[in-house]
């Protein structure tokens, strides 16, 4: 997911990045692919003492702690230092840095669409000579590797993954673990039958600061790919299917009629509730809702704090609408790219795609590995999710993250207006198509 902050905050963050870049080590001698690939826990590390790699990503708080734990073995073995800055203003910082050249060595990229923009601008460095691309491709979840390519060259690699559209619930209300609902109609029927004293069928929180609305876009995406299939889904985010198309309207209608209309507190509560706290009413007495839809990474953001996986909470995959697309999974991930090809930067990014590196974050929790060989999951739920990502029959990537920046921002904004009841479906789709008419031409 991508976020934007107001300009005064952004300027301060950009200033911090400038200082970080100035404080980094002087350009080091170029290193070949072997020095990067060997700099990991399981191989002989290159000697990079005194060198610094500047990195920015969206991770703060517990996620930042996990990332720092992930890079610690590399720092210990190479002698280099990772200077990390966590911010939700990735878009703004990189957009400001492209023209000036004031950029970090490595960065978590906002999404595949922005990665292509950075490549076109000549800012991102290709990774084909930095890591063994064949090995990376064979070890990475199918469907992700091509998202990091532009004109056949690899510019972005995934160091962490996520499954979106999981249905979270409390087994104390009803345990779905032995036979989760397979279809949407079955899900709605079972939620109603097992609702008990819960006040509503669904919990929903879509507030996320300047990025408010993105959790609602996930609802649309998960519904659409299962109703209309991956071809329509991919053509839609690419601007080839109009927002006013009947298939798109059907997904929006399902969201409004089946979800928002049956949400705890209604749409006005949903737009005011932080997404990480959206599922909190599951555990109230009486429960506020019977189910909550969110991605696998929600457990790493403080959701279900002090709750035990499998006992206090559980999850199952988003059910199907059309049996033809029953194996569809919406995935997401953290795409990393390199702006400065120093020896230390090349070594670090080659390390980050390995299973030993990704196992560190996986074991901490709240993350799925993009590497299929990582398996150190902390609980059965996380392990199942990891298998979903690695073995999906139909894997599509988060649609909004692949849209042009203006389109993505408008999608978020109109989902807030729609959910809160300030806008009708037809009005929202017409407005979004008007933006699409220009956004895809830039």
For each feature predicted by the language model, list its residue ranges.
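Conserved N-terminal structural module of periplasmic/extracytoplasmic solute-binding proteins
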Residues: 22-116, 121, 133-136, 344, ...
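Hinge/lid segment of periplasmic solute-binding proteins
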Residues: 40-47, 112-165, 215
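Conserved C-terminal helix/tail region of periplasmic/extracytoplasmic solute-binding proteins
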Residues: 52, 389-442
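A structural signal for short loop-to-beta-strand junctions that line the ligand-binding cleft
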Residues: 96-97, 104-105, 136-171, 325-329, ...
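Extracytoplasmic/periplasmic solute-binding protein
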Residues: 155-159, 188-241
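Glycine-centered hinge/linker elements that transmit conformational signals in sensory
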Residues: 237-272
